Structures are given as C-alpha cells and as structure tokens.
Amino acid sequence: MSTTVGLDLEVHRRELTGYCYRMLGSSFEAEDAVQETMVRAWRAADSFEGRSALKSWLYRIATNVCLDMLRGSQRRARPMDLGPSSTADTVLAPGLPENTWITPVQDDRVLAPDADPAELTEYRETIRLAFVAALQHLPPRQRAVLILREVLRWQASEVAELLETSVGSVNSALQRARATLEEVELDTTDLSPADPKQQELLTRYVDAFERYDIDSLVSLLHDEVKFCMPPYPMWLSGPLEVGRWMLGPGAGCRGSRMLATSANGCAAFGQYRPASPGVHEPWSLQVLEISDGRITGLHNFLGPELFEAFGLPARLFD
C-alpha cells in the first residue's frame, strides 16, 4: 500500500473511533477495534476495487470487527443501570471487572474540532454516557443500524449494502432499535461546556473540591444528582448522600488537585489525591453532567489507566 493510501486511512481514524466507541461502550476496546480495522484495510488494500468510497469500505471493516468483538460479550453498563441507589454508609462491595462498565472517552478522540457547531452539539449528545449505555441494550446488528442511520445519517440503502442485507431488514431493525431505546431512561444534560455560566459553575466546583468545602460543593448539586464510582457497583442519589459520602468514606480525597479535560461531550477532571508530601497521584477521572445550572451527574472512574489515555500527567508536584 502506498503512503498516500495509508494517510487516507488515518483521516478517518477519529470518526471510526467514535463509531466503534458507540458500538462497544469502551474507549480502550474502541481504540483496539480501530487499530484492527486499519490493519485489515492495509492488508486488503490491493483488493479494494473502488466500487464504493474508501469511507464506506472502512466502515464495513470496522462493523465486522465490532461484531466479532461483541460476540459472546456481556452488556456494558453504568452502576445505576444495575440496581437501586445505596446510602453513604453502605459497605462497598468488591469492584467488578473492567468489562462490566461503560468507560469514558476523551472528546478529542471522537469529535472533530472544526465540525459545524450544530453538528458538534448533536455528536456530543450521542457520546453521552447515558446514550452509550442505552445503545448496549440493543443486539449488535441493531446497534450498528441505529448508529449508522440515526447518528451518522447514512441512507437505508447504504446500510443495507454495508450489512449485506435488504433495505426492508434495515428499516425493520431500526424500528425495533428505536422501540427499545424509548424504554430506556436517558438523563438530560446541558452540552455547552464553553458557556460562561457553566464555566462559572465548574470553577466553583473545582474550588470547593480542592478546598474540600463540602457544604459549598453540595450547594452546586442538583436535587436528583447521581454519584457513582466504577468499578464499584454502588451509586448514590441526592446531595445529602453525596455530602455524607464525601465526609465519610470519601474523606481520603481531602487535599486533592484537579486538572480539566473533557469526556463524552461533558466537562471532566483528572483528580489527583495526595500520595506523599508535595506529590499527588491519579485517583479518579470525574465526568460531570450538568442541567438547569446544577450538577446532575458525578461519574468517578477510579484508577490511573484512563489518565494516560486522556493525556494527563502521571503525577503532580507542588
């Protein structure tokens, strides 16, 4: 394969990552799927006859890769998808394996910075944690149909050609997928991280968290805020329980420092806990959901693995 064709493949990496992420629910698996797609495309380049666009050909390969990866796998979810809320004094159950959970993805890996603003808002909506979790309720082929038709705006005939099926089958799968998603509760989130009011809220949140002023922090939370900490299945509902947790089992977060990033179309922060005098180490990637000027979701993804994926430093020094 020529260098030129290789560069043509790379042009599509970001959008393929977004597609595979929606299909798989894991940023790590999405990266693996895209890499496998590129390898297969590279090896099969001589057989690409050009009857379809390079983009369509790549999506066919990526879809097959994702379907292969999903064969026999369990449905990924958020803690609130698996059971009722707990209270702050609940004893933590053991953490569940990584393949239990939806994992966050950095916006830059899936969203084109030069996209049309209206299109960018729509794409943010379709990488929200709640939406990606809802997609996992669909059988894999239905999932592919819905993403290609509803998110990427492909024609039914294009999807039928990709999946080697009929237009009627595509339309039927789309109807079933829509019906399933209508039964899944989707949280509402204000997806305008650059909005001045939202920026002010985030500044106040970081200030309260770093000072560990829990009264101030709780005042920023929505009455129906949800708080979770994958890999633990426990989740909390309401400002009171979140505040109790922060002052109780979560008190080890006192003295943390925060670095801003973005994930799943939302504001996010790398939280670094004190490790030794003058040194802070990765603890949690926090993804914040906001609605009506208050924080409605606090998703704390524990562990250092995501920090490297998000380009965050391995430690902070005073």
Regions found by a protein language model. Give the residues of each.
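Sigma70-family region 2
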Residues: 26, 38-54, 68-77, 136, ...
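A short, charge-rich alpha-helical start-of-domain segment used by transcription regulators
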Residues: 1-18, 28-31, 42
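Solvent-exposed, charged amphipathic helical/linker segments at domain boundaries
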Residues: 156-162, 167-255
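Hydrophobic positions on the alpha-helical face of helix-turn-helix-like DNA-binding modules
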Residues: 37, 61, 130, 146, ...
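Low-complexity, glycine/alanine/valine/leucine- and proline-rich hydrophobic stretches
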Residues: 243-318
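Structural recognition of an alpha-helix C-terminal capping motif at a helix-to-coil junction
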Residues: 32-39, 52-64
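Short amphipathic alpha helix immediately N-terminal
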Residues: 136-155
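Arg/Lys-rich amphipathic alpha helix in sigma70-family domain 2
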Residues: 63-81, 89-98, 183
